[in-house]
Amino acid sequence: MHKFTKVFFVAILVHTLKSGLVFTPVSGTAIDIDKDGKFADRITINHFQSDMEGYKAYTYQKEGDKYVNISKVFYGERLLKVGGYNMKCDYVFYIKVFWKGELAPFLIKLKYYSWSWAPYKKHFKLNPQLEWEEVFIPTIDETSETGYRRLFKQRMDNPFSLIGDDLLASYKPFKATKAEQVIAGTTEEEKSDKKKYVLMVVVVVVFVVVASLVVFLVKFCLK
């Protein structure tokens, strides 16, 4: 009986430690995005509705270069479908914009983070910089894209111009539905989650020790 009790509590402890790792970003690589799910080697993104709207586009390959298709979607939580699995991914940090022509306007690198655990790790990994390539049509006043279209048209006419550098450096196109995260530091929410799981581990360890002691005393008394 004592043997099975130890196995049971060890299993609980391992499960708790494993659950705690859900909140640990893992290393990995960037992803490619496929809007319609037609390519097996790309990732399909389905967006959950939120109160923040914007124009989003998806990358596709053409003669070795990346271009974009534009589609209006919602911001907020998203669900990444990786292989046969689904993964929630929260975001948002900053973007960089690159003009790619009249019909394929912007290519963007968007920083993000995710709280995920296996089996997703086998199919999708985050890198330490937490970056993923995505596209976005930015606007100066967040209600009209005219301003940025005009700005980038000027940049195209004069590639060496510094027009708009100040705007590009300071522009933040939207706010995440959850609090924005800071890559370099640990957020209060993250600290709180870590404390919660550390406390859980401590409680389980204490419980295992006490239970083992009780079993030992009972076994000793029965002798």
From Swiss-Prot:
It is found in: Membrane. It comes from the Eukaryota. Residues 219-223 are cytoplasmic. One of its GO terms (cellular component) is membrane. Residues 20-197 are extracellular. Glycans are attached at N69. Keywords: Glycoprotein, Membrane, Signal, Transmembrane, Transmembrane helix. Its main location: membrane. The chain crosses the membrane at residues 198-218. Residues 1-19 form the signal peptide. It is a single-pass membrane protein. This is 23 kDa piroplasm membrane protein. It comes from Theileria buffeli. The lineage of its organism: Eukaryota, Sar, Alveolata, Apicomplexa, Aconoidasida.
